[in-house]
């Protein structure tokens, strides 16, 4: 969770539309991230707008973040995180700074539930493909 640079709220919605379009064009474009679930939320705290990024993925945290940096670099797309206060300007060449920023802004959950806690997203996709055949 992190504070948005004032006036940048529309950038988040535009960026979300870019991701939706990319996934519509190529459903596997985010595959490297091994995502089960991704959710973005904008909300106000004391008159300031904050961004919450919630992702459930199959890799460990550092690998997920490094893969995200790699994905952005390979596609030439910048990250919407550039619109967050304190986000490192050198994130493209400094993955550890990206990881540190995200860890610093991470909020620990006190309850999590997964219907399939020991099954990867890839295994779920395989099972669904088998069922459909």
Name the predicted role of every residue range.
Residues 1-50, 55-66, 70-72, 87-133:
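Short S/T/G/P-rich N-terminal loop/turn motif that feeds into the first structured element of a domain
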Residues 74-84:
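Conserved His + Asp/Glu catalytic blocks
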């Amino acid at each position: 969770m992190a504070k948005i640079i004032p006036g940048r709220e529309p950038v988040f919605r535009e960026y979300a539309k870019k991701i939706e379009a990319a996934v519509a064009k190529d459903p596997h474009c985010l595959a490297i991230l091994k995502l089960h679930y991704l959710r973005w939320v904008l909300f106000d705290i004391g008159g300031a707008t904050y961004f919450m990024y919630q992702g459930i993925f199959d890799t460990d945290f550092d690998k997920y973040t490094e893969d995200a940096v790699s994905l952005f670099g390979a596609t030439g797309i910048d990250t919407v995180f550039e619109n967050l206060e304190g986000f490192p300007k050198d994130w493209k060449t400094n993955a550890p700074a990206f990881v540190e920023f995200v860890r610093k802004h991470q909020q620990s959950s006190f309850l999590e539930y997964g219907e399939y806690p020991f099954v990867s997203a890839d295994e779920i996709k395989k099972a669904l493909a088998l069922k459909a055949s």
